[in-house]
Every structure is written in C-alpha cells, then in structure tokens.
Design a protein with these regions (language model features):
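Bacterial N-terminal signal peptides that target proteins for export
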Residues: 1-10
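Bacterial N-terminal signal peptides
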Residues: 9-20
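Acidic, serine/threonine-rich low-complexity disordered tracts
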Residues: 23-118, 138-227
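Acidic/charged, solvent-exposed loop-and-adjacent secondary-structure segments enriched in E/D, K/R, S/T
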Residues: 114-129
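Low-complexity, intrinsically disordered short segments enriched for Gly/Pro and polybasic residues
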Residues: 126, 130-132, 138, 143
Length: 227
C-alpha cells in the first residue's frame, strides 16, 4: 500500500506542471488569491482515501514583484492531525514568460520533502502560471503545448470544450471549459494525466473549478466564493 500516499501528490503535481499558452500575462490583475475546497473522487480516489486525506482546502495565488510572477498552489486537509500540506509553484518573467524557478514541498504524517530548482527550458511553466496565461489569452481552437515534469517534457493539447453551467458551493456559474490531454508523438513521452479547467465568463476569467485525473483517481477543486 505504499504507493497510495503518492497518488495525491502526483495528482496535484500534475496540476502545477502545466504550460504557458504563449503571449504576455500583462492583462490580468497584479496580485490575486483564490480559495478552493478539494475532494478525492473516483474509484482509486476512494481507495487512496483510506490512507490519505480525501478532502480539504486549497489556495491558488499570483503575486508580481520586480517584473516577475510568482504563482503557487497550496492544499491542506483537516483530516491531518498535524499541519500537513502540499505546495507547488514557480517564478517566471512576466514579459517573456521565461521560467526562472520551480519548487514543490509536502509534509504529511511525519514525512516531508521539498525541491527547488532552476528551470532552463523555454516556454514551459507550472500550471498555476499556465492558468494565468490562459485567462489572459483564452484559446479559441485546439492548441499544442508542452508540459515540464521533473525535468521531462511532455506534449499536450489544450482543447476549448465550450460554455457550461457549473454547480459550485456558492451556486451556479457560467464558465468556459478547457481540457488538457496528452498526445502521441513519435519518439516523445506521452503525458498520462488529464486536466480540466473552468473559467468564469467575468472580465477576470476567474478559475472557478479545476479537475485533475491520474491513475484512476480524480481531485476536484471548487472555488469557495462567488467570482
């Protein structure tokens, strides 16, 4: 059963290793913080919940300083008797979208681990900064991108699905749905995760819902306040 404690970190890591969609991110607000509730779902999510937290709260933040954008995702769970957490983020150059650093850290049931390293691959960002870029320049048709995961590069496609009504904790919200999937390219690795993103139709394109799927388990994050 040792592999089950790795499922949630892998799912959340999938969330933060998402590419930029190109262009500048100048159009969105300078500093933002979004609060979410999250829950493990699906068959493997239920099984993993026997060994790992099944629900909790999270935050997605975007902070600018000296021409850099710091994006970070943090999740916590009240199921932890200690102050358990998972944290992933990156720092990029706002003007060029060039990645500078990426980091990850977690602490759970007495086990902790952290990593902080420079990122030299052009055009590849963590998912939080990627979401920031999608909000600034929403794709109108399928767009090929790459994701960076622990030094490995994976090709993906970003697919605009359409406008949907989503039921969230504060009520119904009209949102634009985007799906991110791995693609098969000869001699390149295939990303096995799935990511779905719903952006409100407000001026800020608020990220109201995020769904990460991996290893038959789902993590669903829902915005706790009305956009």
């Amino acid at each position: 059963m040792k592999r089950f404690p790795k499922i949630l970190p892998a799912l959340i890591l999938a969330l933060v290793l998402f590419p930029s969609l190109g262009g500048s991110v100048e159009g969105t607000p300078a500093n933002e913080e979004f609060r979410y509730r999250w829950q493990l779902r699906n068959f493997m999510g239920a099984v993993a919940g026997l060994f790992f937290p099944r629900q909790g709260e999270g935050s997605l933040t975007f902070m600018r300083s000296n021409g850099h954008l710091k994006s970070e995702l943090t999740i916590t769970s009240p199921q932890s008797k200690e102050e358990g957490y998972f944290r992933y983020g990156s720092e990029i150059d706002v003007r060029t979208l060039q990645p500078i650093r990426a980091w990850s850290a977690y602490s759970w049931r007495g086990e902790s681990k952290s990593k902080n390293e420079a990122v030299s691959k052009d055009g590849v960002l963590d998912v939080a900064a990627g979401i920031y870029a999608i909000r600034s320049d929403p794709p109108k048709k399928s767009r090929r991108m790459q994701i960076w995961s622990d030094g490995k590069i994976y090709p993906v496609v970003v697919i605009p699905v359409g406008t949907e009504i989503r039921q969230l904790p504060h009520g119904k919200v009209t949102a634009r749905h985007y799906s991110i999937r791995g693609v098969n390219i000869p001699n390149e690795r295939r990303w096995k995760g799935k990511l779905d993103l719903w952006l409100a139709t407000d001026e800020a394109a608020t990220p109201v819902e995020i769904l990460i799927s991996r290893n038959m388990a789902d993590v669903r994050m829902e915005l706790m306040s009305r956009p």
